[in-house]
Amino acid sequence: MSDSTPLPPVRLPSEAELARDALATPLLSRAARLARWAGPDTRVDSGGGLVEEQLAAAAEALGLTGRSAEGGADAGAVTDAEAAEEAQAEASEAWRAAVDTGLVEVLDEEEGTVRAGDNLALLTSGSPAEVLHIWLDALDAAIADASVPDFDDLMDVMDEGGEIDFSSLDWDPQAEAEFLEGVLANLYLLTADERAPEGAPVPLPALAASVVVPSDVAEPTDAMMEEVSTAMMRLDDQFRILAPTGLADFRPVDESLLIEEGQAAPQTPDDEPEDLERYGVVRLTPLGLYGLRARLLDAGYAAPALGDLAGKGADALLDGTVHYGPLAARAETEQWLARREPLAAARELLAAARGGDADAPLRRLHCQQALSLVGTEAEPALREVLDDPELGGLARVWLAEHGAADIPAPSQELVFWLTVDTVAAQLAAEGNSEELVALVEGLAAQHSGFFDTAWRVDHPATAEVLEAMGRLHPDKRIAKEARKAAYKARSQQAG
């Protein structure tokens, strides 16, 4: 994923709603409870972790004692000792989150004493943005923890002096972090894609395959599928760690599918939804979408949210929505128009649509689409540009669609210029789509001698459009005519 190409825009709830969601997450709510529970007798070890002797009391303060802490499907099969151990582990994680987010501060490292951190008060008196900043710190820490090997693996490589021999681990910290970051980025993209059903969960095997199998591979090899299975189990462990942050709704891999040493059954899941769900599914929450977007922005990616452009000028709107899908572009435009008077908005859009740069045709297409959302109050603005060589064509289209009278007939030069501009915009928006192929066929069929005139059109994209028509038209004779016309257009531009 390139950090220069804008990501699809996402629709986010308000900061107030997101902050409420953050406060309700298991990890942050437990961290806050432990921060308030801590007192003068609370002690931490050299790493800031709660001392082992106080874990049971911390678990009790969180209400995690008794049955299995999470109360899962197999809770009845868990012994009291196992339940207590699990509860203490979750209490330890919550305490670590309290320290990582500044809800608790270590007063004296030698004595192991603590006090409430300054951020604790912000959870109740701070702004939504301040609450979300605290939650983001918890998320960052959880993502870092999820990239670290399992504790049992660390114990296996501990030497006699109690030091961990990291060289004995089959673990590359950077590669592990990059793997998880890649998975989370792909989950973000899958969630942001407007073609995907809203709120649809992503099967864990598909998510694993997205970072293992190259995009240009149609049929994965057996070795690739084995790697997907291994990656799926890594993700199962990692999302178990991340789920309490509220990042995602997660259904783990069905334990009946697991065989010795914690590996998944090798067979590929069927396409039936019930079967896929047994292999684990994950759905990014609105809070998770917000969190991953914040991380992507920090990493330098262009990760827009719907509404970002509503307060900016028309030039920012038309340039910004160039890479949006049609639904997102319309939603962004509706928010932009809602803040403006129709006539003033139309004039601003038309002024921003001018230009001879490579993005200008798509900008004019988006201008035309935006103007379709404006009522007849905008008519004076459209009449003002009827003689404009770049805008006169779309102005006539708008006036005709709105039933206006006294629309001057366009010149042949304007008709052909608008045709080239329209095809150039469609090329930029859709590439070689079926709709564009149909448009190309229709143009060649409707206009006798089309190519004899088209190559003379004074438009920066004339040669590119004619080359595309030669590439897309199914009739070899007509395609050859288009290529010849493109050559003439190139020669004319060079001269």
Regions found by a protein language model. Give the residues of each.
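Short inter-helical turns and helix N-cap capping residues of alpha-solenoid HEAT/ARM repeat scaffolds
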Residues: V281, D357-A360, D387-G392, D458-H459, ...
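Structural detector for internal amphipathic alpha-helices that build alpha-solenoid repeat scaffolds
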Residues: D319-H323, R330-R340, L362-L373, E384, ...
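Alpha-helical adaptor scaffolds
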Residues: Q335-L337, V397-F450
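Accessory beta->alpha helical hairpin/"wing" motif in late/C-terminal subdomains of nucleic-acid enzymes
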Residues: S92-A94, T101, E105-A177, T230-R240, ...
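Short, amphipathic alpha-helical interface elements at domain boundaries
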Residues: M1-L103, E109-I134, A146-M224
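Alpha-solenoid HEAT/Armadillo-like helical repeat scaffolds in large eukaryotic proteins
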Residues: V253, D308-L309, A316-T321, E348-A358, ...
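Charged, amphipathic alpha-helical linkers/stalks
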Residues: V281, A299-T333
